[in-house]
Amino acid sequence: MIHSYATHRNAPVRVGIGEDYYAEEADAADRDEYYSSVQDVLERGDGEDIYQSLNGLLGSTHRDLSYKTARRHLYKTIDRRPDGALYYLYSGEGPKNEEEVDGPNRRRLGNYNCEHVVPQSWFHKRRPMKSDLHHLFTEKVRCNSSRANYNLAEVEGESLPNCGIVDHKDDEFEPHAGKGEVARATMYFLVRHPGYVGDRRVETSPEDLKQLLEWHEQYPVTDYERHRNDTIQDVQGNRNPFIDYPELAEKVDFQSGFAS
């Protein structure tokens, strides 16, 4: 698991510096143990069988955190780069000055907050979806607001520096960075929380899933995501199977995840 430390609760937190940022062997052991009960289905089952097995596993191992607790973990340990600074999802960057990311300065500056890859309005701000760390990411307030509750897609529209492209006509948003991350976060959500996505025009539909699958293939899993995945298991209990086994994206039948 990921090791972290803080010198004081109001001091900047540095986590996983250098080679300790992502412990590959420890993560592999965690992964193998986590999926051991469904491994046979993952290898031999059909798309619906795999979906149902993963849905049961992700749900039974999920600890429902308060939103406050989830964000505390997100900012302090989960969304950190190898140098210990925060990572912004849609720009692929973060604060250059570590003073920006300590608790008091964050509240005073108000320059970043919590982005829900699956917007809160799609699931009426209900828990456990609201605090599910696998689709929560740190983002600049301005960029988070610009994305609003728009669907993720490749679009032409207003370009926002270090953020993305917004198409206000079709209610769509294309991030500047993080396309692989948002694809895998959305696929996780469809498996973990079925029935909340796809019943309104602004939401991801089965047709839109094709674009996410393309991003998933085009932008492979990074050590940042692996660090997130293992660290989230520490605090929330479950994992994102599309980070652990990227090939599952082509095997899972996601139809059961969409609202009817």
Predicted regions and their residues:
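Domain-level detector of nuclease and nuclease-like folds
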Residues: 101-260
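Active-site-adjacent structural elements in enzyme catalytic domains
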Residues: 52-114, 118-123, 132-135, 141-145
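N-terminal module-boundary/linker segments of secreted carbohydrate-active enzymes
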Residues: 1-92, 248-260
